[in-house]
């Protein structure tokens, strides 16, 4: 009887969600880019009357670009502009028979170039802007700073983006450790946990930015990923039933499948500082001031090393905001990016 009830419940759920029209299946255009064994999904949505396309590049590596659409900040941008969301290889809903030989930063830069060319071919009369978040900031910096790729765009938005892995691992350490004494002194503190962080860094003074996951756990415990989790959850309800049953999303969207630490050791050595000097287009470094994942000093570092004229580059740090302004501070996120696009389109 219990199994029958479950089957009936699932049937009713499927019926309910299938009776409603889903934005994911009715809005925009959905297609794939196949390259070197990877079949990468691309969703173009938003305001097709706009002359502007904002190509987004997700973080991780190993996250999913389609998830940007669930963030209120990106939804507001979709009202004004066309937006491109896509999943990188080894990420999100990407399929295919690609192998570990393609799990390297240069291949991801090549994939990004293919995506840009595909968008240019399908929408030849549009003005392009590029946005990279977290690892996507690092990826877009590496891409823009090579082979004159920045000439394809009117502007670059670096959203809490990485750039120099070794430096950022140390900045995370400097962000985390000064907060531990106060945490240890709090009434009822979990002293074992907080002391463990101190001990871990003593044993691992120079962690890998990509191969060591522990610092990211510590940042999250200190609200450096999401500044206020309660507010975040209230403002960002995720429509899981709709995503699973009435969208192009598959269950693989919820599974991190980027690989093992030993497969990405070379990623810890990424430094795209030289590429920054080759980028001369307008640039906006948009950051959560309280970001502990990619601390806000990185925004200043990127600004200082960019080849862009000072009159066309700026750093904006949003208070009481962690690693995701698009979800934590959507109004400020939208206002800053919209103003940037309107200025340089």
PLM region descriptions:
Residues 63-73:
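The serine-hydrolase catalytic nucleophile loop
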Residues 125-171:
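Conserved hydrolase catalytic core segment
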Residues 292-298:
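Conserved alpha/beta-hydrolase "acid-adjacent" motif
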Residues 321-330, 334:
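Catalytic histidine-centered segment of alpha/beta-hydrolase-like enzymes
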